[in-house]
Design a protein with these regions (language model features):
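Charged (often Lys/Glu-rich) extended helix/loop segments that serve as interaction or gating elements
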Residues: 1-131
Length: 131
């Protein structure tokens, strides 16, 4: 059998692993020094079989509610992103070498998603429905 970790993120946020198997280091927040003795596939939330961040990756035991950090996504994470299946892009967090972090891009909102509809009569109705 195989164990899977399903995360809130998906290929919308980081397409490289799904597209061509790019490796990104993954840690479990607060368990950085724990032994990596459990093998998992780390999967995204899209309904596509290639929406995976890692296959057969050894990580510490992961429990419901744990936060996973996918490292070294760089500029390509956002630049290669897309709004497949209506998924909105997540915020981006910069992890500094000293362990501190900061948000460098906010999460998309439904208003962002529909922004290019502003030239159509339905746009005002969409905005009303979002409020």
């Amino acid at each position: 059998h195989k164990e899977y970790i399903g995360v809130d993120s998906c290929a919308v946020n980081l397409m490289r692993p799904a597209m061509y198997g790019a490796y990104h280091h993954i840690t479990v927040l607060g368990k950085e020094d724990a032994p990596c003795d459990h093998k998992y596939d780390v999967t995204g939330s899209l309904c596509e079989n290639n929406d995976k961040f890692a296959i057969d990756r050894y990580l510490p035991k992961v429990d419901m509610g744990d936060l996973l950090v996918i490292h070294d996504t760089g500029a390509h994470g956002f630049a290669m992103g897309y709004n497949y299946n209506g998924k909105l892009k997540s915020s981006e967090i910069l992890l500094h070498e000293d362990g501190s972090f900061e948000m460098i891009r906010r999460a998309e909102t439904p208003k962002d998603y529909f922004a290019t509809f502003d030239c159509f009569p339905i746009y005002e109705k969409l905005l009303e429905d979002m409020e």
